Curated annotation (Swiss-Prot):
The gene is PNS1. Residues 1-41 are annotated as: Disordered. It comes from the Eukaryota. This is Protein PNS1. Residues 82-108, 158-163, 232-251, 331-346, 434-460 are extracellular. The chain crosses the membrane at residues 61-81, 109-129, 137-157, 164-182, 211-231, 252-272, 310-330, 347-367, 413-433, 461-481. Its main location: membrane. Glycans are attached at residues 97, 441. It is found in: Cell membrane. InterPro entries: Choline_transptr-like.
Length: 513
């Protein structure tokens, strides 16, 4: 069908023989005024473009609950860190003795700079490669993933680790089957990847937002880890920290405090991650709906999206994050019980907990995946979490397989290339230490920590771009499923390309929850 048959915008495309609308009660025809009111309106102010229906403060009780959780975590951190500080000399100050102390001399400064520069350069090259040859990028990533899984399977068979070998063989065969049966969808995924990267280049604030999020998450993860150790120091009955002010010690108190610390840590981490996701989704939403409007797009979309995520929509963020945090906490307990069962020789109970852990892990993945799209609705339309969840259910009901395949293709490739960057930087760091031979590594004891540090840091650098691409892809898919006529009107050539590779773009989802 010729692409010249598009009707005049702003109506949806009307190709003969194509189903156009998935009507979800109430239907579009009876609610056009209210339906189109959901779309962001042109304005110079982000708050005016992305208006929120009353009540503006969505899901506010969960904001209160989150703030109480943060206050409790801060209180426990203050007590336990004080105990850790006062017993620091008894705990030991380093893994290594004084003769092996790792000092920041010129050599290490150059090494850190070298790691960061190489990681950034390789990450940029990967993005350039993905933009220039998206189909080859995705196909290569998927094939390499299959080869890597097959190689791991063969290694485990050679090592006579048959249980792991069979698991990897099953997953590798399943991955190969998915690739072969769904390979015709790669062109659509490639087009979406192109568009997402182009928007990322147009809005550098997406990368800045992700970078800030990585730093904040890293700092909190460090604090979280230290508080866990400090909790043992303060409340373990056999610890020297029992004599420090802040309450007595007992096994029950230790377990109770640890439960809260783990819950609070998971909860706060989830909230941080989702605030960043909503902020980036708001930037992509600005581009999708308003970049080509006559009045222009709002100024400072990143700041406006972040402000809304931290105010009107923060309760919705806390609501969805709470669900994931509870699942994570339960799964952590199950993993502890599993380890204790196997450690005590009770293999029957251990297998039961192993199966339960797998089920909880699958549920955790489903909820995270669901939340990822639900928060796109929160970012774009300012709805409460439950209303966004119902819209997400409609999206998954009608286009869930399309979204899942698209995400799997792109994310698998991105994660594989990210791991490649980590391997390359870690190898270069090893050669750097080997050939410069710094004094602190004269005995070779710092190869492992420096190489591990290089791998982690380079991976974090690459994750900055990956987080943006992942959020951008999901936001674009949500907006395209809900309002394809907007993209048809503002990006006609791109829309034609998407239609050729993905005719289901005409199957518009309309809902009013």
């Amino acid at each position: 069908m010729s692409n010249n048959n598009y009707p005049p915008p702003p109506n949806p495309p009307n190709y003969q023989g194509e189903e156009q609308v998935h009507n979800v009660q109430p239907d579009l025809e009876n609610n056009q005024e209210k339906y189109y009111a959901e779309q962001p309106q042109p304005s110079q102010q982000f708050e005016e473009s992305f208006k929120i229906d009353k009540p503006k403060w969505n899901d506010w009780p969960f904001t209160v609950f989150f703030l109480l959780t943060v206050a409790g975590f801060i209180a426990i951190a203050g007590i336990t860190l004080n105990a850790l500080k006062k017993t620091y000399g008894l705990q030991g100050s380093s893994i290594y003795n004084s003769t092996d102390t790792f000092t920041l001399n010129t050599n290490t400064i150059i090494l850190f700079g070298f790691i960061i520069v190489v990681g950034v350069v390789l990450s940029v090259l990967i993005i350039v490669y993905a933009r220039m040859a998206p189909r080859v990028f995705i196909t290569t990533g998927l094939i390499l993933n299959i080869i890597l899984g097959l190689g791991t399977c063969i290694y485990y068979f050679v090592a006579h680790y048959y249980s792991a070998a069979i698991v990897f063989l099953v997953f590798t065969l399943f991955t190969a089957w998915c690739y072969w049966s769904c390979r015709h969808r790669i062109p659509f995924s490639a087009t979406v990847l192109e568009i997402t990267i182009d928007v990322m280049k147009r809005y550098p604030s997406t990368l800045i937002t992700s970078f800030i999020g990585i730093i904040v998450s890293g700092l909190f993860s460090t604090l979280f880890s230290v508080v866990i150790v400090a909790t043992y120091v303060k409340y373990d009955p056999d610890s020297q920290g029992c004599d420090v002010a802040g309450g007595g010690c007992s096994q029950s108190k230790l377990i109770g405090v640890l439960v809260f610390v783990f819950f609070a840590g998971y909860y706060i981490s989830e909230v941080i991650k989702n605030v960043i996701h909503i902020t980036i989704a708001g930037i992509y939403g600005t581009w999708y709906y308003l970049s080509n409007s006559d009045q222009g797009e709002p100024k400072h979309p990143a700041l406006g999206a972040f402000k809304r995520a931290m105010t009107y929509c923060f309760g919705s963020v806390c609501f969805g994050s709470l669900i994931v945090s509870i699942i994570q906490l339960i799964r952590s307990f199950v993993q502890i019980l599993k380890q204790n069962a196997f450690g005590s020789g009770d293999n029957c109970a251990g297998c039961g907990f192993l199966i339960l852990d797998f089920v909880l892990g699958f549920i955790d993945w489903i909820v995270r995946y669901f939340n990822h799209y639900a928060y796109c609705y929160v970012a774009l339309y300012g709805k409460s979490y439950l209303k966004s969840a119902r819209d997400t259910f409609d999206l998954i009901r009608f286009k869930g397989m399309d979204a899942l395949i698209n995400d799997c293709f792109i994310n698998t490739s991105l994660n594989l290339y990210s791991m490649f960057v980590g391997y390359v930087v870690a190898l270069l760091a090893y050669f750097y230490l080997k050939f410069t031979d710094p004094a602190y590594n004269s005995s070779g004891t710092f190869y492992a920590p420096v190489v591990a540090f290089s791998f982690l840091i380079s991976g974090q650098i690459t994750r900055i771009a990956l987080t943006v691409i992942s959020s951008g892809i999901s936001t674009f898919f949500v907006a395209l499923a809900k309002d394809p006529e907007v993209f048809q009107m503002t990006n006609r050539d791109r829309f034609d390309e998407i239609f050729r590779n993905y005719p289901q773009v005409l199957q518009k989802i309309t809902s009013d929850h």
